[in-house]
Amino acid sequence: MPYGLKRYQQAESLHFITFSCYHRLPYLSGPESKHVIETILERTRLRHEARVYAYVLMPEHVHLLINEPPNILLAQFLKSFKQTTSRKLKGSREQFWQDRYFDRNISGEEARSEVLQYIHRNPVKRGLVASPGQYEWSSYNHYATGVRGTVEIESEWTARHRRTHSSQ
């Protein structure tokens, strides 16, 4: 939960969330831990009817562009997600996640587009890959190809898929 920051909560409002591993240690460096994170993010998204617009799993932190779920506070959504992943991945570690997270309300298409680009370029900026499409642990390839990964991404591709399947 962010301390000392005002949060403007509104159903369906869009949030750019960043949270880190305990002491910013690279607990997410291996593919196994990233796969667990993606799987639990999708389960939590489904359970609370949240819409994920973008994400990236970095070695020591996570970025999400997500809406305020309709039936639960975003803080409760994140608590549920972090507790579940922590139980699954913690092992002998004292703590898996930092307690706090950063939350920035996003309004307008320009701000949304900037955050989307920032999230997808994060692995390139860090030198993990040469281009966003080479990084497996983000929503970039969904936007580039429309292929659904482990986490359902809210996009034009997804909306088109829903319309096609609901009319059948």
Walk through the language-model features, giving the residues of each.
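Short catalytic/metal-binding and nucleic-acid-binding patches
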Residues: 1-168
